[in-house]
Structure formats: structure tokens, C-alpha cells
């Protein structure tokens, strides 16, 4: 839900397939600041950072650990709140509030497909709650199965991934060759591309043969998400009991990379 808020610019919610080691995770930031400047709370409590940093090396709270069906509301403080929460609330505070009481069963299922390409997201969620042991409990489970989308399937995207140097060399003196793949006349300090550039899958760009690595990446990775939520609370005349358990598993099944960055 938060990705549609203009105040959450700078966040990454999508498939961040090129963001290093944190594929499958999501971070939310406010006012375009870095990840460490927004305080993320779950039920008004601070959370530990994700096990891997962002591609910029910053720690952040992975908001993908919460089953979407377990969310009751999201509270956003768009102003700085360092006087109340400390330096990690420079950009503001976001509080994800989950269900603490629910009676009955709720099931949600959704499918999203790209209109022009063979990529699909399938989501399934279950929320169940009631009363037991003189208290109230809520259980939620959600899954996401995401199919991959390779850059080679999208016109004019993969060809943007070209190496900056390329396979070429420079002659130190004027020379000429009568035969062979390098046949021709060359001036001093001239840069010469690989004559087999195009046949080997490269792209001629001026005097250089650029390596086309863009088609080796995914725009969307093949991912499987499983998230679970359990809350139990009980009140008595002497004391109030409350327990919350969150569980999340993310499998990135393929993450193709370039064999080289020449």
C-alpha cells in the first residue's frame, strides 16, 4: 500500500533485481531520504534490521515480513520526530498496525499479470481469529509466487546494458595488413575493435566493441514468499498478557548476473 504514497519517494518495493544481496526485501523511506532516516515500527515497537544491508550499504527494516492480510492500518508521521524517537526518525515515522482481535475467517487471493509479457504474481492470504484460553488470538498466513521476467523479453531494455570499455586495442605505430581479420591500414594510436564483435554478440560503438550484458539480467526475479503472523492476548485483574510472533521466508530462485563487466 505504501508504494502509492507520494511521501514515500525513495523507497524500494518492487523486485530490486539489481540491488545486490537484498532481493525479495522491501524498504520504505519518507521524503526521499536514505533508509536510515525513517523509523519503521510494528505495533509501535522498534524492529531489528534486515540481515543484509541495502545496495547503498544502509541498514533498514524489511517490511516484507508482515503478511498483508494481517495489516489493519498504517500510520505515517511525515514530519521529523528526532526529539521523541531519536536520530533514526529524521524523515518521519511509519507504524504498521496489525490485527490484535479478529473473529472469523478471511481469505484473499489475487493474480497480477503483465499486459505484454509472460510474468505473473500469485498471492494467497488467510486471516483467522477467535477466542481461546480466556483470551483472543489472531493467525495470518500469506504466500506470494512470482514468476521471472528477463530483460531480453522487453524491447529496447536489454540493449541499454552495454559495457563502458569493450574489447578493443590501440596500435602504437602506423601499420597495414593485407589479409586476415584485421586487414586494413591503421594510423598511430588508432583504437581498433574486435573484428568478430558482432558475430560474437557484441555491439560496435565507434572504435570499440561493447559487451552486451543487459540480456543476462532479470527485470523480475523468480521468487517465493511465505509469511506468518500470530498474536495472542489475555487480560486479568492483575496483569495483561500479550504475545506476537512474525515469521517470513523469502526464496529467490534465480538471480542471473553478467559473467563480466569489461
Region annotations inferred by a language model:
Residues 3-25, 33-35, 45, 49-262:
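Surface-exposed beta-strand-turn/loop segments characteristic
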Amino acid at each position: 500500500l505504501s508504494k502509492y504514497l507520494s511521501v514515500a519517494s525513495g523507497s524500494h518495493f518492487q523486485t530490486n533485481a539489481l540491488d545486490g544481496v537484498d532481493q525479495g526485501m522491501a524498504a520504505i523511506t519518507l521524503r526521499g531520504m536514505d533508509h536510515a532516516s525513517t523509523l519503521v515500527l510494528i505495533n509501535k515497537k522498534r524492529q531489528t534490521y534486515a540481515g543484509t544491508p541495502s545496495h547503498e550499504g544502509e541498514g533498514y527494516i524489511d517490511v516484507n515480513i508482515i503478511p498483508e492480510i494481517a495489516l489493519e492500518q498504517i500510520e505515517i508521521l511525515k514530519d521529523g520526530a528526532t526529539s521523541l524517537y531519536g536520530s533514526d526518525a529524521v524523515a518521519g515515522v511509519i507504524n504498521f498496525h496489525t490485527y490484535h482481535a479478529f473473529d472469523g475467517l478471511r481469505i484473499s487471493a489475487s493474480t497480477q499479470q503483465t499486459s505484454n509479457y509472460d510474468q505473473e504474481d500469485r498471492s494467497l492470504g488467510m486471516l483467522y481469529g477467535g477466542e481461546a484460553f480466556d483470551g483472543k488470538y489472531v493467525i495470518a498466513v500469506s504466500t506470494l509466487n512470482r514468476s521471472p521476467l528477463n530483460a531480453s523479453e522487453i524491447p529496447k531494455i536489454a540493449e541499454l546494458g552495454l559495457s563502458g570499455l569493450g574489447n578493443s586495442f590501440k596500435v602504437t605505430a602506423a601499420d597495414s595488413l593485407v589479409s586476415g581479420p584485421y586487414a586494413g591500414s591503421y594510423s598511430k594510436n588508432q583504437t581498433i575493435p574486435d573484428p568478430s564483435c558482432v558475430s560474437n554478440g557484441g555491439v560496435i560503438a565507434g572504435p570499440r566493441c561493447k559487451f552486451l550484458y543487459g540480456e543476462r539480467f532479470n527485470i523480475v526475479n523468480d521468487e517465493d514468499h511465505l509469511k506468518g503472523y500470530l498474536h495472542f492476548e489475555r487480560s486479568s485483574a492483575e496483569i495483561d498478557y500479550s504475545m506476537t510472533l512474525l515469521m517470513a521466508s523469502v526464496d529467490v530462485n534465480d538471480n542471473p548476473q553478467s559473467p563480466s563487466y569489461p
